[in-house]
């Protein structure tokens, strides 16, 4: 039962961390939110702990104040010689008190590659990670209609004829010295017999050891970062990189680079052994292919003395906006202000001017892009990107802060200029329009 005690201990650590995160933002008078799932007041359930499955020895309930209360199941003392462990039940039973065979727990199943899997069922997926190493395999589990898959690095084996084991995509050695521990549902999970494989296997924070020592905390389906790829910081043998696959989306849209897994659309700087992180190259995961491009720095900067900053490819202008009449909260005459950035790039007679507004609700950056050639507007468009993606763009300079009303005036004037400058030469009209975003000092320091 040491393995089960270990799993329960991990769960209560997770409950503490989960509760501290959700107390302020996940509170509601009518429901509780736990592991990104809503529960009604009074509703009870067994929590799901990846990759062990449902923890039947823990009961959770949604209290009236919106808090999740979880408690360990206390098993009664049995007075029979051979108690029986039953799947989907925590406590063993005496043979004469077994429940009916058709008493099944129903949960939402998963559909993957034409096969239906039940909630809590583990299986092996082929072809999910296109660039996996020969000693790696992908193991998946079904949880409430979602498929959770992990890229697992298998331990090095020293035997000639390894065997397959239940609920694991890695093969292990068969031997007299095999140890075992109880799985969450009472199944027996075999540990590699040879010393080297066993030592490597125990370094995985996802696999329960036979006694009490653990390599670290596992990742849970309810973790806040589980949208896209979740990357384990350890790169040792036996680690798992966990991703979430939603049944409504295509499977296998991930890329693996330098031992790390990235979801479709995610960007990163490559890490080369000889050079470290290459800041001037940006790679993007396109379905399962990596597309890497060199970052081109501008020849001219809107400031006189751009600075080189560690971790950035291109030089950047110092972020010192003009002195304006803002209070300590960044407001102007009681109205909330938002940062405005500008970028000007000139090449071969073509000027690309970008004006960006950073907002908090929603948390994004709205970028207005003007492409002008010989004074004639060639192209104009607006794009909205995340703050994280905007942070990867190093050619923007913080120029001022503005209010929502001033930004509306800017966009209205911009719409007029986009029509006028497409048919006649515009030299300074756009530069003049940007001045609308600058907030002047109120007369006599009164609003």
Curated annotation (Swiss-Prot):
Keywords: Developmental protein, Differentiation, Glycoprotein, Neurogenesis, Osteogenesis, Repeat, Secreted, Signal
Free-text description of this protein's post-translational modifications in UniProt: May be glycosylated.
GO molecular function, one term: transforming growth factor beta binding
SMART domains assigned to the protein according to its UniProt record, in alphabetical order: VWC
GO BP annotations, alphabetical order: AMPA glutamate receptor clustering; BMP signaling pathway; cell differentiation; embryonic axis specification; excitatory chemical synaptic transmission; eye development; negative regulation of BMP signaling pathway; ossification
Tissue distribution of the protein: Expressed in heart, brain, lung, liver, kidney and testis.
Gene3D superfamilies the UniProt entry points to: 6.20.200.20, Complement Module, domain 1
Domain of life of the organism encoding this protein: Eukaryota
Residue ranges, annotated region (Disordered): 200-224
Signal peptide: 1-22
Major location category of this protein: secreted
InterPro entries, per database record: CHRDL1/2, CHRDL_1/2_C, VWF_dom
Glycan-linked positions: 113, 286
Job description of the protein: Seems to antagonize the function of BMP4 by binding to it and preventing its interaction with receptors. Alters the fate commitment of neural stem cells from gliogenesis to neurogenesis. Contributes to neuronal differentiation of neural stem cells in the brain by preventing the adoption of a glial fate. May play a crucial role in dorsoventral axis formation. Antagonizes the function of BMP7 and may thus play an important role in the embryonic bone formation. Shows no inhibitory effect on the inducing activity of BMP2. Plays a role during anterior segment eye development.
Protein name: Chordin-like protein 1
Organism: Mus musculus (Mouse)
Gene: Chrdl1
């Amino acid at each position: 039962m040491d393995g089960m005690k270990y799993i329960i201990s991990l769960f209560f650590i997770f409950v503490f961390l989960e509760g501290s995160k959700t107390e302020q933002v996940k509170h509601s008078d009518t429901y509780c939110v736990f592991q990104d799932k809503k529960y009604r007041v009074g509703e009870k359930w067994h929590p799901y702990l990846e990759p062990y499955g449902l923890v039947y020895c823990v009961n959770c309930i949604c209290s009236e104040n919106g808090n999740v209360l979880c408690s360990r199941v206390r098993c009664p003392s049995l007075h029979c010689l051979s108690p029986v462990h039953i799947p989907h039940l925590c406590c063993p039973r005496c043979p004469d008190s077994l429940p009916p065979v058709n008493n099944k727990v129903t949960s939402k199943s998963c559909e993957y590659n034409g096969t239906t899997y039940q909630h809590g069922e583990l299986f092996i997926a082929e072809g999910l990670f296109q660039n996996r190493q020969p000693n790696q395999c992908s193991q998946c589990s079904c949880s409430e209609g979602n498929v959770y898959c992990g890229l697992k690095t298998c331990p090095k084996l020293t035997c000639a004829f390894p065997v397959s084991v239940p609920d694991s995509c890695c093969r292990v050695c068969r031997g007299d010295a095999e140890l075992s521990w109880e799985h969450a549902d009472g199944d027996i999970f075999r540990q590699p017999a040879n010393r080297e494989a066993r030592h490597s296997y125990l370094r995985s924070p996802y696999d329960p050891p036979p006694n009490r020592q653990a390599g670290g905390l596992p990742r849970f389906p309810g973790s806040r970062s589980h949208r896209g790829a979740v990357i384990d910081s350890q790169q040792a043998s036996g680690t798992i990189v966990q991703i979430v696959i939603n049944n409504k989306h295509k499977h296998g849209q991930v890329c693996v680079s330098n031992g790390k897994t990235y979801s479709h659309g995610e960007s990163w700087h490559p890490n080369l052994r000889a050079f470290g992180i290459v800041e001037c190259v940006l790679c993007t995961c396109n379905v399962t292919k990596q597309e890497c491009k060199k970052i081109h720095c501008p020849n001219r900067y809107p400031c006189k003395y751009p600075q080189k900053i560690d971790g950035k490819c291109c030089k950047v202008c110092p972020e010192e906006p003009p002195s304006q009449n803002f209070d300590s909260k960044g407001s102007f005459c009681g109205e909330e202000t938002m940062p405005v950035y500008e970028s000007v790039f000139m090449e071969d007679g073509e000027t690309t001017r970008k004006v960006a507004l950073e907002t908090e609700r929603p948390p994004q950056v709205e970028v207005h892009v003007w492409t002008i050639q010989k004074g004639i507007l060639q192209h104009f468009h607006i794009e909205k990107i995340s703050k994280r993606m905007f942070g990867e763009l190093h050619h923007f300079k913080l120029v001022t802060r503005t209010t929502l009303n001033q930004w509306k005036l800017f966009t209205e004037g911009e719409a007029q200029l986009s029509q006028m400058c497409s048919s006649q030469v515009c030299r300074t009209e756009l530069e003049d329009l940007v001045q609308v975003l600058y907030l002047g000092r109120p007369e006599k320091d009164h609003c």
